[in-house]
Regions:
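Nucleotide/pyrophosphate-binding catalytic subdomain
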Residues: 1-264
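Glycine-rich beta-alpha junction loops
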Residues: 38-39, 223-225, 274, 278-283, ...
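Preference for bulky hydrophobic residues occupying beta-strand positions
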Residues: 182, 274, 314-316
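Short gly/pro-enriched beta-turn/loop segments at secondary-structure junctions
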Residues: 212, 269-270, 307-311
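Conserved glycine-bearing catalytic or ligand-binding loops at nucleotide- and phosphate-handling centers
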Residues: 255-285
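A conserved regulatory-domain signal marking ACT and ACT-like small-molecule sensing domains
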Residues: 285-319
Length: 319
C-alpha cells in the first residue's frame, strides 16, 4: 500500500488534476491520495477573511473569484453531466456555508483563530470533493474524523495515540483508492476544526503512511526532487538521487521548501521511505529518502546547499 500526496500546484488546474488521475489510476495496489487545496486558494481564503474582518466590502469580490475558480475546475475535469451537476451542488453547499461565515466575520469585524481555521479548511474540503469524482473508484474520507489534535503551549499538536487508532479503524478494510483532504484536523477535546499548519498536507500523508505501515510515502509536487542548490541561483544545480532522513531534514530546515519538515518524523521512526516526484514529469525518478546513507563515492562530499535569505544566524557559546 502506498500513500500519495499531491500539493496545490498538482491540483491547481484542469490539466494538472487530469495528470493526477492518470498517475493514480496507473497504480495496481491500494493507495491513499492526500490532496491540498487548489493552488493559491489557501492564501486567497486568508486574504478574503482578513478583508471581511476589516469591514472591507470588497471581500465579496474576492469570494466570488473563489467560487468561480472551483466551478470552472469542476466544469473542466468532470465530463459526465449528471455527475458534474451533483458535484457542483455539493460544492455550492460548502461555498454557501463559507459565504455565511465570511458574512458573519464582516458584520462583527472580528476574525478569531477558531474561525480562521474553519475558513481555510474549506480549501481542502472542496479540492478533495472534486478530485474524488475525477479518479475512478475513489472513496472520499473526512480527515476531521481521524486526525486529532491537542493544545500544547497554545499550539495544536497531533495526538498520535488516538489518531493512529482512528485511522486503522477508518481504513479497515482499505479501498482501492482512498481520497483524503490534507491539512485539516479536529480537537480531541471539543471537536473544533484545527489544522496542521502551512504545508500540513505533507504531514497528513506522513501520519497516514505511518499508521497503516505503507511501503512508501510519495510526495508529488512541481519539482523533480531535492536539488543540489537553488536552481534560480545556481543554474548548474541538479536533482539529488538519494538522501538520508537527516540530510533531508537539514535541507528543509534551512530553506529547501520541498517537504514540510514535521513530515519526516513519523515515517522516520517506522523506517518508511519518502520519494519526491514531479506531477508534471512523472517519468523522472525523483529523490529517494530513507535511513540509509550513501557511501562516499569520491565525487561529491556535500550533498546539497540550501539557504534562507535575509536571515542572520547567531551562535552564542561560553567556556
Amino acid at each position: 500500500m502506498k500513500v500519495l500526496k499531491f500539493g496545490g500546484t498538482s491540483v491547481g488546474t484542469v490539466e494538472s488534476i487530469l495528470s493526477v488521475k492518470k498517475i493514480v489510476e496507473a497504480i495496481d495496489e491500494p493507495v491513499i491520495v492526500v490532496v491540498s487545496a487548489l493552488g493559491g486558494i489557501t492564501d486567497k481564503l486568508l486574504q478574503t477573511s482578513m478583508m471581511a474582518a476589516q469591514g472591507d466590502v470588497a471581500y465579496e469580490k474576492e469570494f466570488s473569484a473563489i467560487i468561480t475558480r472551483h466551478l470552472d475546475v469542476i466544469e473542466g475535469v468532470i465530463s459526465d453531466l449528471e455527475m458534474r451537476r451533483s458535484v457542483q451542488r455539493r460544492a455550492m453547499g460548502l461555498l454557501d456555508e463559507l459565504g455565511n461565515i465570511l458574512r458573519g466575520v464582516f458584520l462583527i469585524n472580528d476574525l478569531s483563530v477558531k474561525t480562521s481555521d474553519t475558513i481555510v479548511s474549506y480549501g481542502e474540503r472542496l479540492s478533495s470533493l472534486i478530485v474524488s469524482h475525477v479518479i475512478n473508484d475513489a472513496q472520499l474520507f473526512d480527515s476531521r474524523k481521524f486526525i486529532k489534535t491537542v493544545k500544547q503551549f497554545n499550539k495544536h499538536v497531533v495526538d498520535f495515540e488516538q489518531t493512529n487508532q482512528l485511522i486503522r479503524e477508518t481504513f479497515n478494510p482499505l479501498p482501492k483508492v482512498s481520497l483524503v483532504p490534507g491539512f485539516i484536523s479536529t480537537s480531541r477535546d471539543n471537536g473544533e476544526i484545527t489544522n496542521l499548519g502551512r504545508g500540513g498536507s505533507d504531514y497528513t500523508a506522513s501520519i497516514l503512511a505511518t499508521a497503516l505501515d505503507a511501503s512508501v510515502l510519495e510526495i508529488w509536487t512541481d519539482v523533480d526532487g531535492f536539488m543540489t542548490a537553488d536552481p534560480r541561483v545556481i543554474n548548474s544545480a541538479y536533482v539529488i538521487d538519494r538522501l538520508s532522513f537527516t540530510e533531508a531534514m537539514e535541507l528543509c530546515n534551512f530553506g529547501a521548501k520541498v517537504i514540510y519538515p514535521p513530515t519526516i518524523y513519523p515515517v522516520y521512526h517506522k523506517n518508511i521511505p519518502i520519494r519526491i516526484r514531479n506531477t508534471f514529469n512523472p517519468d523522472a525518478p525523483g529523490t529517494y529518502i530513507s535511513r540509509e546513507k550513501e557511501k562516499y563515492d569520491g565525487k561529491a562530499l556535500i550533498k546539497g546547499i540550501s539557504s534562507i535569505n535575509d536571515t542572520c544566524l547567531i551562535t552564542v557559546q561560553g567556556l
